[in-house]
Regions:
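Hydrophobic ligand-binding cavity/cleft-lining segments
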Residues: 1-54
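Conserved beta-strand segments that form the floor/walls of ligand-binding pockets within enzyme
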Residues: 13, 19, 79, 90, ...
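Hydrophobic beta-strand positions in extracellular immunoglobulin-like domains
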Residues: 20, 66, 120-122
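Short amphipathic alpha-helical segments
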Residues: 23-26, 150, 154
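Glycine-rich portal/gate segments that line the openings of hydrophobic small-molecule binding cavities
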Residues: 48-102, 110-112, 153-170
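Beta-strand/loop substructures that line and gate deep hydrophobic ligand-binding cavities in soluble
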Residues: 95-153, 162-164
Length: 170
C-alpha cells in the first residue's frame, strides 16, 4: 500500500483481489459464512447473528467481537447491506446510514473460476480509531495509513485462505 496522506474524514478505501479456481457459488458459500471471517482474522475474534437469524440477508445484523494489541478489545454491531448470491455480500459497521466502516466481497466469474475482491471503507462515522487520532491529531494521516495497511494485510490473508478452501473443496 502506498502512502496517500489521507485522513479519517476522507473515508479512505482499500481493496485486495485474488483469482480462485472455483465457481462463484462455492466461493460465495465461504464469503457469506460470517463465522469463517472470525476463524481467518487475527483481529475479529467472534461473530454472532442477532435477532434470531442464522444467515445473511439484507437487514440482518450480527455482533463482531474484536481484539487488537494497540486498541484493546471492542464489540460492534453490523448490518448486511447487500446480499446478492453469488455476486456481492456487504455490511456496514454501526448505523448503516452512517457507518463507522463498510466491508464488501464482490465475486465475478472468470472462466471456470472466480475473481474475488474484498473491499473496506473507513468512516464516515467515528470509530475506535478516533481515540488515537484525537490524542495525536498531528499524526492522523500516519495513524490512518497504518490502519489501512493492517486491513490490506488482513484482506490478503483472508483471500488466500478462502482461495485455498474453495479450491480444496472442488
Amino acid at each position: 500500500m502506498e502512502w496517500t496522506g489521507q485522513v479519517y474524514a476522507d473515508s479512505p478505501v482499500v481493496a485486495a483481489k485474488i483469482l480462485i479456481d472455483a465457481p462463484p457459488e462455492r466461493v460465495w458459500d465461504l464469503v457469506s459464512e460470517i463465522a469463517l471471517m472470525a476463524e481467518l482474522s487475527s483481529e475479529l475474534q467472534e461473530v454472532t447473528w442477532l435477532d434470531g437469524v442464522t444467515g445473511p440477508a439484507v437487514g440482518h445484523r450480527f455482533t463482531g467481537r474484536n481484539a487488537h494489541p494497540a486498541m484493546g478489545e471492542w464489540e460492534t454491531v453490523s448490518t448486511v447491506t447487500e446480499c446478492d448470491p453469488p455476486h456481492r455480500f456487504a455490511w456496514a459497521v454501526g448505523d448503516p446510514a452512517h457507518p463507522s466502516a463498510s466491508w464488501r466481497f464482490t465475486l465475478k466469474p472468470d472462466g471456470e473460476g472466480t475473481l474475488l475482491e474484498q473491499w473496506y471503507q473507513m468512516g464516515p462515522a467515528r470509530s475506535g480509531l478516533n481515540i488515537a487520532i484525537d490524542a495525536m491529531p498531528d499524526k492522523e494521516a500516519k495513524i490512518v495509513f497504518v490502519r489501512m495497511r493492517e486491513h490490506e494485510t488482513g484482506m490478503r490473508h483472508n483471500l488466500a485462505e478462502i482461495k485455498d478452501r474453495a479450491e480444496r473443496a472442488g
